[in-house]
Design a protein with these regions (language model features):
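GST-like domain detector, emphasizing the conserved glutathione-binding G-site
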Residues: 1-128
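Short, solvent-exposed turn/loop segments enriched in Gly/Ser/Thr/Pro and often Arg
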Residues: 34, 158, 203-204
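Alpha-helix boundary recognition
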Residues: 45-46, 94, 146, 184, ...
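Alpha-helix N-cap and coil->helix boundary residues
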Residues: 64, 88, 178-182, 198
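Active-site-flanking alpha-helical
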Residues: 74, 166-167, 200
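Short, flexible loop/turn segments with low-complexity composition
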Residues: 86, 198-206
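GST-like fold's C-terminal all-alpha helical module
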Residues: 100-195
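Acidic/histidine-enriched, glycine/proline-rich intrinsically disordered or flexible terminal extensions
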Residues: 203-218
Length: 218
């Protein structure tokens, strides 16, 4: 049975996995989750009752969480790229992966999910806190990211795949202004990467779904 990936082209965590699969030219069947494909949503919830994606099916095994999926594929279907290096570099990659998911992505999503609520249930205070935390993350990244092309140097790793969708959408929620020149330059390099550009283009048709309104850029 070939690999099956349940997800959506507009989903940041789906991007994270897609970029790795595309880069390694790993064969897989994409099963889009959405109103036009109810059978995929049903199968996703059967395998993972929380209904969250991405989810990878490998024979009779279901693997959830984007980072876990990438580690599973690297272990069982290795390609030419080493997404998590060994040793100290690998620990740095895992640390940055957590920073990008928990400090950038999570706060971006907090603002976005609040916008999806009915107006009477929205919480401006929570949105303000999440935006402030995004600015804190921007400041930390500006000061601590490697000055090389990618997060840990010359090698494009799991950390870069985590930050590409994180910074892409975070900038839509809380713009990364001119006060963060290194971070803006890094975001631009990420968006110029062919596989990140592919993810952006394949998601372009779904921009009307963004609850805050997609800006006229990128």
């Amino acid at each position: 049975m070939s690999l099956q990936l349940f997800g959506h082209p507009f989903s940041s965590y789906t991007w994270k996995v897609l970029i790795a699969l595309w880069a390694d030219e790993t064969p897989f069947k994409f099963r889009m989750v959405g109103p036009d494909h109810p059978e995929n949503g049903d199968e996703l919830r059967r395998r993972w009752p929380f209904g969250q994606f991405p989810l990878l099916v490998d024979s009779d095994q279901s693997v959830v969480e984007a980072t876990c999926i990438i580690e599973h594929v690297q272990a069982h279907h290795p390609g030419p790229n080493r997404w998590i290096p060994d040793g100290e570099l690998g620990r740095r990659v895992r640390f940055l992966d957590r920073v990008f998911d928990l400090r950038v992505m999570a706060n971006m999503q907090a603002v976005m999910f609040d916008a999806l609520r009915p107006a009477e249930h929205r919480n401006p205070a929570d949105r303000s806190i999440a935006r402030e935390r995004l600015r804190t993350a921007y400041g930390w990244l500006e000061a601590n990211l490697d000055q090389s092309p990618w997060a840990i140097g010359e090698q494009f790793t799991l950390a870069d795949r985590a930050v590409a969708p994180s910074l892409f959408y975070a900038d839509w929620v809380e713009e990364i202004d001119e006060g963060y020149p290194q971070l803006n330059a890094y975001r631009a390099r990420l968006l110029a990467h062919p596989l990140v550009a592919r993810a952006v283009d394949e998601a372009r048709a779904y921009r009307p779904l963004f609850p805050l309104g997609a800006p006229d850029r990128d």
